Swiss-Prot record:
<feature type="transmembrane region" description="Helical">
    <location>
        <begin position="539"/>
        <end position="559"/>
    </location>
</feature>
<feature type="region of interest" description="Disordered">
    <location>
        <begin position="227"/>
        <end position="324"/>
    </location>
</feature>
<keyword id="KW-0472">Membrane</keyword>
<feature type="compositionally biased region" description="Polar residues">
    <location>
        <begin position="240"/>
        <end position="260"/>
    </location>
</feature>
<feature type="topological domain" description="Cytoplasmic">
    <location>
        <begin position="560"/>
        <end position="574"/>
    </location>
</feature>
<keyword id="KW-0813">Transport</keyword>
<feature type="topological domain" description="Extracellular">
    <location>
        <begin position="521"/>
        <end position="538"/>
    </location>
</feature>
<feature type="topological domain" description="Extracellular">
    <location>
        <begin position="164"/>
        <end position="460"/>
    </location>
</feature>
<feature type="topological domain" description="Extracellular">
    <location>
        <begin position="37"/>
        <end position="42"/>
    </location>
</feature>
<feature type="transmembrane region" description="Helical">
    <location>
        <begin position="43"/>
        <end position="63"/>
    </location>
</feature>
<feature type="topological domain" description="Cytoplasmic">
    <location>
        <begin position="482"/>
        <end position="499"/>
    </location>
</feature>
<feature type="topological domain" description="Cytoplasmic">
    <location>
        <begin position="126"/>
        <end position="142"/>
    </location>
</feature>
<feature type="transmembrane region" description="Helical">
    <location>
        <begin position="74"/>
        <end position="94"/>
    </location>
</feature>
<feature type="topological domain" description="Cytoplasmic">
    <location>
        <begin position="64"/>
        <end position="73"/>
    </location>
</feature>
<feature type="transmembrane region" description="Helical">
    <location>
        <begin position="461"/>
        <end position="481"/>
    </location>
</feature>
<feature type="topological domain" description="Extracellular">
    <location>
        <begin position="596"/>
        <end position="614"/>
    </location>
</feature>
<keyword id="KW-1133">Transmembrane helix</keyword>
Length: 642
């Protein structure tokens, strides 16, 4: 056994932290620079969940887990339950005795219960398998152990409905508490005549920022604000100021029965500031940004012919047999596009902003994250498919086609399996609706069907298949060759017949951890500490100390108990014990942010749940710089006696 000095132990424990925080810093910087937008973050996150993480899981489990490791898998599952249970207990005690807002009663339990048990420990282990403490083989086995922990996390948060703790914090408006469009438009500020004296470039960037913000809100505001309760729906008059903030134009959902409403918290914005001075400057070409071909999506139409041509094109897309349900929107569009809007209106209101142009705008914040991840409106109903808003009739027809691929893409099961924060209580209640009536009468049927649905998640399926392969030696021999696998006929290159699949999963899965840490940094870069609930900082600080300073002590004691019970030993299972120990010192899962955002209506101006989550998470990562190296140094020198 290799012996190391105290200085070596400290350096070995600190070095992985440096690498991890450098990668997190890259993601933080990319978010601040506008390179990694919230849309890009979600896309990459879904790629990690559906491709990269399943590939990594399959590769590491098949290559490093054998049939004799069944006992280790059981110990990991038991340890995971103890970690989750201890965190839940500490969070409950803190909630009981310290000031916590009632709107975050469930969120604090989830925050204390579920750690970030995927990217962080894997990155830490892969930095310690250089031979001084652990070999590369031990490091790979440690990664496989972490993936078993991750599987337990997925089962608890998704299959068993742990996300319901977060969802239970939210109470939504009803028809009586909602505010109508006519009420909200009264509070909209008029455009002052003094704005004509403002500097051109300042107005330009102000318009850019407004368009950038309204890219997320305008379509939702119009579509959710407009509905029909019949052919004679009472439609309050919409003012010019309200129609100016509609971008792009949208078609309402005919299935909506809601009255014309607009959320309470929506701030009225005027997305297009068309003044006489701007028109004259645009005509003279005196705008310095236009003359320099700056990155912008605002293209002023200086001639009435081009403007009218674009409007005629949009109207030509409407069919003559358009149903009555679209009449309200049609009226609004024509009012906005005809005499009520200036002829040199910016067509940026009708076009999305290019991602490269967003980099010139202010950094995205937590509100943009909410708008991207939110799955509910102010009433708690599932938000409409935004891809159908603003689409012409040809696009709607193609989207609603009954092709097999389109059916798969739009299925609820696909939505659940390909993203991490798209499930809700409604998905549990509607599970099993296609089953026979005699099966649906049992109260546990929806829960069982929902549990089985979540087992189809790519990562869960990869782990199930990988463990099945790993525990059957002759099947494992098709993928890898080890000392315990039987000899079978090899491929022409003297490798196992299915070794190419291991090459594929190993190559693709290697990108999982770096991407995960970059996304973590980008998410942290958008968090902001707002106006906290009075005294909440005491509860947050106390729970963070309990999680990252007290719980690691329990982890060390648990490892010692496992050895004394004879379940494991320090010679053969030291990597397993090391993984168990550091798992007690991990910060809260970042998925808590995405789940909280998914249950937050995008119109909310002061989301107290997001403010609590932000403050709670931002406390933990600075503390981990000290707590995790301290735990590792102690474990290496005292427990492992290196």
């Amino acid at each position: 056994m290799v012996h190391i000095t105290l200085g070596q132990a400290i350096w070995v424990s600190v070095k992985p932290i440096i690498k991890i925080y450098l990668i997190i810093g890259v993601g933080f910087l990319m978010a601040k620079m506008g390179i990694l937008t919230v849309e890009a973050t979600r896309i990459i996150s879904d790629i990690v969940l559906t491709v990269l993480l399943p590939s990594l899981s399959f590769n590491k489990i098949v290559a490093n887990i054998e049939d004799k490791d069944i006992k280790s898998v059981g110990i990991i599952c038991l340890s995971a339950l103890l970690i989750f249970g201890s965190g839940f207990f500490f969070a409950y005690v803190v909630r009981l005795f310290l000031p916590v807002p009632k709107q975050w009663y469930g969120g604090i339990l989830a925050g204390g219960m579920f750690p970030n048990i995927s990217d962080l420990p894997i990155a830490y282990l892969q930095s310690m398998d250089q031979g001084l403490v652990f070999s590369e083989e031990e490091g790979n086995k440690g990664v496989a152990n972490v993936i078993i922990f991750l599987t337990m996390f997925l089962i608890c948060i998704f299959n068993l409905g742990g996300f319901r703790l977060i969802e239970s914090d939210f109470e939504y408006n009803d028809d009586e508490s909602a505010v109508r469009v006519s009420e909200t438009t009264k509070t909209q500020p008029a455009v002052s005549a003094n704005t004509t004296n403002t500097d051109t470039s300042e107005r330009f960037f102000s318009n850019e920022q407004q368009l950038f913000n309204n890219k997320y809100t305008a379509r939702d505001s119009l579509t959710e604000a407009i509905g029909t309760k019949g052919e004679n729906a009472d439609v309050p008059p919409i003012s010019r100021r309200s129609t100016n903030s509609i971008a792009p134009l949208s078609l309402p959902d005919t299935s909506s029965n809601s009255k014309i409403t607009k959320p309470v918290q929506v701030k009225a914005r005027n997305t297009i500031a068309c003044t006489q001075s701007e028109e004259s400057q645009a005509t003279r070409g005196s705008n310095p940004l236009d003359s320099q071909s700056s990155a912008s999506t605002i293209h002023s139409y200086n001639t009435s012919e081009s403007y009218e041509s674009s409007i005629d094109t949009m109207r030509a897309r409407r069919t003559a047999s358009q149903p009555r349900a679209y009449n309200t929107t049609t009226l609004l569009e024509e009012n906005c596009l005809d005499e009520k809007c200036p002829k040199n209106m910016s067509m940026a209101a009708l076009e999305p902003i290019r991602s490269i142009d967003m980099r010139a705008l202010p950094s995205q914040n937590i509100h943009h994250l909410i708008r991207e991840y939110s799955n509910v409106d102010q009433y708690g109903h599932q938000r409409r498919n935004s891809s159908l808003r603003g689409a012409d009739m040809n696009d709607v027809h193609s989207i609603s086609s009954n092709s097999t691929l389109q059916t798969i893409k739009t299925a609820n099961l696909t939505r659940i399996l390909t993203s991490d924060a798209t499930v809700s209580k409604k998905d549990i209640e509607t599970s099993g609706e296609s089953l026979p009536q005699w099966m649906r009468k049992f109260s546990l049927t929806p829960l069982l069907v929902f549990f089985l649905k979540n087992c189809l998640r790519p990562c869960s399926m990869a782990v199930i298949i990988a463990l099945t392969v790993a525990f059957i030696p002759w099947v494992k021999a098709l993928f890898v060759t080890t000392a315990n696998t039987p000899h079978i006929s090899q491929a022409p290159d003297n490798a196992p017949p299915l070794s190419f699949f291991m090459d594929f999963t190993g190559y693709v899965g290697a990108a999982c951890v770096p991407f995960g840490l970059i996304l973590l940094g980008a998410t942290l870069g958008r968090l902001k500490i707002g106006n906290l609930y009075p005294g909440f900082w005491k509860a947050a600080v106390t729970l963070v100390i309990l999680r990252q300073c007290v719980m690691p002590i329990f982890g060390v004691l648990w490892c010692d108990r496992l050895v004394k019970a004879g379940w494991v030993n320090w010679q053969d299972d030291r990597m397993l014990l090391f993984v168990i120990a550091i798992s007690w010192n991990l910060p809260t899962m970042t998925t808590l942010i995405y789940f909280t955002a998914s249950f937050t209506p995008p119109e909310t101006t002061a989301p107290i749940q997001m403010e609590c989550v932000s403050f709670f998470l931002m406390l933990q990562y600075p503390l981990m710089v000290v707590s995790l190296p301290f735990l590792v140094s102690y474990f290496l020198k005292v427990q492992m006696n290196l």
